[in-house]
Amino acid sequence: MMGCLPTKQVGRSTHSLNPREAVALAAETSFTVNEVEALYDLFRKLSNSIIKDGLIHKEEFHLALFRNKKTNLFVDRVFDLFDQKGNGVIEFDEFVRSLSVFHPDAPEEQKAGFAFKLYDLRQTGFIERHELKEMVLALLDESDLNITSDAVEMIVDRTFDQADTKGDERIDQEEWNEFVKNNPYVLRNMTLPYLKDLTMVFPSFVIHSEVSEADMVA
């Protein structure tokens, strides 16, 4: 159904990135202008892998992350958080802003906030026990780990024992921030090291960049 959307209204009609947009996105994220341009090249490939309309649909997102189109709660949640406008697709500016959270230089508070929203499935402002369990099961489903249901319950119980300091059977943002501060391993998947070397992954952008880094100062 998404493929039936009129691409004139939401898609991109050109194959080049507006230099002003590159500068603006670099100014509000952890990326340089050259890296934003490299991300645009990646975005174009992903957004035309199945439905050729210059937008990343959920099927394309699944394929990019896990090389399959299998439905999974974890992938769905990440997609929903990338889709900041809530229109069922990921546009380029959303792609850059969301990926910036995973940049090695992004503040830990941003990473913690994104992870909190990931687990807050019902978007109530709290992580409840059943939500944490659902997400743990979804993560295990995408991994090669074979863990018993008792072990899953143990993970959930241990997390709540440490994080739910108010003892109300739910974890709020403040409790979560303190929990990840004491358990930094929780956020280890929130950093993608290669995002710091995008111009090495796409070296042509260093040479052919349409915007110089000096323009960032203006």
From Swiss-Prot:
Biological-process GO terms, alphabetical: calcium-mediated signaling
PROSITE patterns: EF_HAND_2
Site (Involved in dimerization): S143
Superkingdom in the source lineage: Eukaryota
Domain EF-hand: 35-69, 70-105, 107-142, 151-186
Alphabetically ordered keywords of this record: Repeat
Pfam family, one: EF-hand_5
GO MF annotation: an example: calcium ion binding
Tissue-specificity statement: Expressed at low levels in roots, shoots, culms, leaves and young spikelets.
Induction line: By salt, drought and cold stresses, and abscisic acid (ABA).
Biological role stated in the UniProt entry: Acts as a calcium sensor. CBL proteins interact with CIPK serine-threonine protein kinases. Binding of a CBL protein to the regulatory NAF domain of a CIPK protein lead to the activation of the kinase in a calcium-dependent manner.
UniProt similarity note: Belongs to the calcineurin regulatory subunit family.
Record text on subunit structure and interactions: Homodimer.
Protein name, per record: Calcineurin B-like protein 5
Annotated organism of origin: Oryza sativa subsp. japonica
Gene name for this UniProt entry: CBL5
